[in-house]
């Protein structure tokens, strides 16, 4: 459905704008696929959390995700349904951890955040073979700023909010480590198709 919609919309632009080249149309199609894919996944996950009455937690963890992952990088699934499944699992893990995990020793938090900042400084942003990082220094600085912001907020928040921040950062840092040590980078199928057709 997403492929069908993006293809037809991009063809509409092509038919009504003769200035667009084939590559321009493919770029429009790729962008539309990405937007529609992300939007549909957000709506589905939103409905799941609406059903279990955990919308505030979902939105908060979603904000953390979108203020760290685009800067640090992360693992991508090959298919839409694989990504949707992993995304639901990701937010469910955060939900369970947030609600059930007890408060830990202060020293643990200090060590964890120091290691997280160090890993971010050394490895972020993660490499991507299809979309090379051109502004690595800027992204690294922004990654550290984002992480520092959430660490400060962590110490100003109640336990469940702290748990949400902690597990969100942990899952992000784990991805950074995996990508840089094992080379596990799964580019989305539509990324591969688009770049193959435009090279």
From Swiss-Prot:
GO terms for biological process: proteolysis; quorum sensing. It is a multi-pass membrane protein. The keyword Nucleus does not apply. One of its GO terms (molecular function) is peptidase activity. One of its GO terms (cellular component) is plasma membrane. InterPro entries: AgrB. Its main location: membrane. It holds the Pfam family AgrB. The keyword Glycoprotein does not apply. It is an enzyme of class 3 (hydrolase). Keywords: Cell membrane, Hydrolase, Membrane, Protease, Quorum sensing, Transmembrane, Transmembrane helix. The chain crosses the membrane at residues 43-63, 81-101, 108-128, 139-159, 165-185. It is found in: Cell membrane. Its EC number is 3.4.-.-. May be involved in the proteolytic processing of a quorum sensing system signal molecule precursor. Belongs to the AgrB family. This is Putative AgrB-like protein. It comes from Clostridium beijerinckii (Clostridium MP). The gene is cfg02.
């Amino acid at each position: 459905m997403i492929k069908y919609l993006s293809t037809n919309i991009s063809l509409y632009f092509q038919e009504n704008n003769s200035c667009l080249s084939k590559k321009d149309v493919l770029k429009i199609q790729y962008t539309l696929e990405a937007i529609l894919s992300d939007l549909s996944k957000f709506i589905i996950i939103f409905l799941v959390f609406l059903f279990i009455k955990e919308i505030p937690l979902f939105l908060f963890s979603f904000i953390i995700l979108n203020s760290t992952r685009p800067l640090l990088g992360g693992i991508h699934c090959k298919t839409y349904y694989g990504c949707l499944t992993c995304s639901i699992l990701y937010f469910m893990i955060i939900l369970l951890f947030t609600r059930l995990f007890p408060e830990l020793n202060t020293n643990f938090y200090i060590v964890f955040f120091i290691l997280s900042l160090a890993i971010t400084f050394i490895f972020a942003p993660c490499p991507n073979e299809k979309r090379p990082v051109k502004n690595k220094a800027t992204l690294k600085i922004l990654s550290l700023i984002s992480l520092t912001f959430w660490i400060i907020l962590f110490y100003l928040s109640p336990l469940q909010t702290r748990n949400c921040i902690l597990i969100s950062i942990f899952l992000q840092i784990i991805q950074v480590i995996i990508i840089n040590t094992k080379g596990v980078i799964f580019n989305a199928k539509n990324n591969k198709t688009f770049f193959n057709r435009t090279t």
